[in-house]
Amino acid sequence: MKKLLIAATVVLVSSSPLVLLPMEKELTLTPKQVQKLTQNTTASLTQFKQVPKNPRTITTILTYKNKDLTEFKTSIQADTKLSISAIFWNAKGEPVFQLQDGDYVAASQKSIVDDSIYNQKPVDMTFWTKDGLTVYKEPYVLGTEKADSKLASFKPIKVSKAAQTHAGTYYLVDGEGWINASDLSRIDNRIEAVQKVLNEKYNNQERISVYVKQLDTDRVAAINDEKSMYAASVAKLGVLYYAQERLSQKKLSLSDEYQYTSAVNGFPGAYDPDGSGKISKMPDDKNYSLENLLKAVAQNSDNVATNILGYYVTNQYDKAFQKSVDKAAATSWNMDKKELTARAAGTLMEAIYRQNGDIITYLSSTDYDGERISKNIDVPVAHKIGDAYDFKHDVAIVYADSPFILSIFTDKEGYDKITSIADDVYGILK
C-alpha cells in the first residue's frame, strides 16, 4: 500500500492499490483508477486553458459540428492559422475551441500551438552565419516575411536580442533582421566554406590532394587527403621535427657540429647528394653546425644537409626517430620510400607549429617563397616544398588571423595549380 497526499499536479502510479490521504481519511484506488487518473492528469497538461493569441495547427486536425466532438465535419491541414472565437468545456470535461465559422476542435497543444513571440530579451553575442541562412523581419511565426538582407554565409555577426517562438530561438542582427539559431554557429565555421569550394572545384581531380586544418578550431577540410604519393623533399619535415624536439629537450645545441664524410650519403633513406641544395655534392670532411644544417634543409631544401642530419642526429632514422615522428604525424613516416599523404604532411607541420621553435623561423624565409602556396598570400607563411619527377608539393602554416595548415600534393600538375588552390583557401580563411 502506498499513501499519497492529494495535490493538484502530482500523481504517483503503482501496480499495487494507491492510498490517498485527504485530511485524516484514507482513500484507496485500484490500479485502473490510478491509470485513469494519470491519463486525465497528462491530458490536462497538454490542453489549453484559454484561447491562444495566434493559434496555428502543427498537425492535421478534425473539426466537428458539436462540442462533444462526435459529429465530424471536415479536416484542417497542418500550418494553418485558426480563427477562434471561444473556449468551452464539453460534457466530458474536455476543453474545445469554437472557430469563427461555428465548428469545434479539440483544444489540444499536441495539434495546435500559440504561434507567438515570447521571452524576448537583450543579448550581446557573436555567431558565424551558416550556408543558406534565412533572415526574417521578425522572429518567425507563420506568415512572417523574409527581410531584404545581404548577410553572407560563413561570416561573423553580432546579435543584440533573442526571442522564442514555436519555430525555435531567433536572434536579431541590427539593421538586418532575425535569424534562427539553427542558421548560426557559435564557432568559426569557415572551414565548411573551404570544403564546399574544394568539392566544387577539385574533388574530381584525382591527381590533387588537399588537407586544410584551422588551428584555432581543429576543424578540417580535405579532398583525396589519404592518397599516398612520393613526397620528395616534404619528407624532410620528419628530420626538422626530430631535431627541434631534441633541441627543446636540451639534448642538442645549435652550435653542435657534424663532419661531412662519405658515409652520410650512403645509408638507407639518404637523399641523392646531386639534388637540391648548396652544400658541396662531394664529401669535404668539413664540420657544419646544426644551425646551418637546419637552415639549409628548411630554406634551400638541401639534400646533403638532410643526409648529415639523418646520419648523425636521427642515427640513420633509427627506432627512436621513427617512434617520435610517427606519433607526431599520426601515421608511419617512411624515410626510405618517402611515400606520404597530404594529411600526414599537414599533421606533422602542425606538430612543428606546436613546437614553436627555430624551425618555424627557418621555414618562414626560403628560396621558394615566390611560388606555390605563398606566392599571392600577404601574411607570413612557413612552408616546405617537395619536387621530384611529376610530383610537386607544398605544405604550409599560413599565419592568417586564424592560422591554418595547408598541405597540397600534386601529380602531373604545375606550380600554378598549387597557387590557385592556396588562393581559394586563403580567400576564405584570411
Go through each PLM region and give its residues.
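Beta-lactamase-like hydrolase cores
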Residues: 183-228, 298
